A protein has these predicted regions:
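Acidic catalytic patch
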Residues: 47-50, 72, 77-97
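Acidic, PIN/NYN-like endoribonuclease modules and their adjacent C-terminal/linker elements
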Residues: 1-6, 108-143
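Short, well-structured N-terminal submotif of metal-dependent ribonuclease cores
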Residues: 1-44, 59-69, 143
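Glycine-rich anion/phosphate-binding loops
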Residues: 100
Length: 143
């Protein structure tokens, strides 16, 4: 998979991609590709940061100090999309129209509200186009 430059896309990255990059022992090939994706400035949401942190504590056995550094890094290097009333109400509409789960609808709504054109996720339908503007991509599938 080729990773486009930030000038060519505004990408939102789901927590599963971050976790492959941050917990390298899971799958070395996926970890390498995920690391390339997150090396570029990306869009994340508060929900993604929370999911990454809880998994780093549980599975990655990271210390609270390391978690604090992860949080700082997210906020200093990437655009953090808020989880506010507008995003939550858009998620309701997405559940109605696209049949996303509750948590997935919040991810998609945050990506849309932040102006993302690509959503990297292993958990959603590859190549799905949402609202004619957001393409869901599973970067681990062969093109």
């Amino acid at each position: 998979m080729s990773v486009d430059s930030p000038a060519e896309q505004r990408a939102f990255v789901d927590s599963n991609i971050w976790l492959y990059a941050l917990i390298a022992k899971q799958d070395p090939a996926k970890s390498e590709l995920a690391a390339r994706i997150i090396a570029l400035p990306q869009i994340v949401s508060v929900q993604v940061i929370n999911e990454v942190c809880v998994n780093l504590l549980r599975k990655g056995r990271r210390s609270e100090g390391e978690i604090a550094e992860v949080i700082r890094a997210f906020h200093s290097r990437h655009h953090v999309a808020p989880l506010n009333e507008d995003v939550m109400l858009r998620a309701v509409e997405l559940r109605r129209t696209c049949s996303f789960s509750y948590w997935d609808s919040l991810i998609v709504a945050a990506a849309l509200s932040a102006g993302a054109t690509v959503l990297y996720s292993e958990d959603l339908q590859h190549q799905q186009l949402v609202d004619s503007s957001l393409r869901i991509i599973n970067p681990f599938l062969n093109p």
